[in-house]
């Protein structure tokens, strides 16, 4: 579940809605029913594909449901979107990490793509956004990544700010004669 969320950027409801018939193993594609009932075919990368195979062969209980991800007890009930979120939170807790929501994995994929040089339209295509505005939300400013690109303010020394730097900056005369 985590790999499907993190590598494909699916929403938790899309993961919950995956059925066995949605996976075309021959073509390496996944059919996803997205927001608004839109049906889209996505490539299935090797890593999440192998994780799904491992779940289907070693983890998923025998059951009649066609849902890919099911409960263990009671056996074979389709997981809800809320249960997908719970799986993410529980995995974080077991790993000793701060709890995050399933949607944070979608954000992380977008951030990783942008850091690797993908354009906003490319990220939007992977996330299946209809609007560029939706994708722009994922392009939050990354201070750490931007710091090496920014030129220092004239007269400032590299490194951490001095404790009284703010006070000194207030004493500087304003351009245009104001002080």
Over which residues does each language-model region extend?
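Short alpha-helical segment immediately N-terminal to, or the first helix within
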Residues: 4-5, 18, 112-116, 126, ...
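Short, polar N-cap/turn motifs at the start of nucleic acid-interacting alpha helices
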Residues: 23-25, 80, 97-99, 118-139, ...
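C-terminal secondary-structure termini that scaffold catalytic or DNA-interacting sites
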Residues: 153-179
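Basic, alpha-helical nucleic-acid-contacting "clamp/cap" segments
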Residues: 25-29, 33-74, 87-94, 158-161, ...
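Short, basic (Lys/Arg/His-rich) helix/loop patches that form interaction surfaces
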Residues: 42, 85-125
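Short pre-functional
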Residues: 1-11, 29-30, 111-112, 154
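Short, charged phosphate-coordinating catalytic segments
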Residues: 5-26, 120-122
């Amino acid at each position: 579940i985590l790999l499907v969320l993190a590598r494909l950027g699916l929403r938790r409801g899309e993961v919950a809605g995956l059925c066995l018939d949605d996976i075309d193993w021959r073509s390496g594609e996944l059919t996803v029913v997205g927001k608004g009932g839109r049906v889209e075919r996505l490539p299935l990368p090797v890593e999440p594909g192998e994780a799904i195979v491992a779940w289907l062969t070693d983890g998923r209980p025998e059951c009649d449901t066609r849902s890919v991800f099911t409960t263990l007890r009671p056996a074979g009930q389709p997981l809800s979107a809320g249960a997908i979120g719970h799986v993410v939170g529980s995995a974080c807790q077991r790993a000793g990490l701060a709890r995050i929501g399933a949607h944070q994995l979608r954000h992380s994929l977008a951030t990783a793509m942008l850091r690797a040089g993908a354009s906003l339209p490319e990220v939007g295509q992977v996330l299946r956004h209809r609007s560029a505005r939706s994708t722009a939300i994922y392009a939050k400013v990354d201070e750490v990544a931007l710091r090496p690109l920014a030129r220092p303010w004239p007269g400032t020394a590299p490194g951490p700010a001095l404790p009284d730097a703010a006070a000194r900056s207030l004493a500087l005369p304003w351009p245009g004669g104001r002080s």
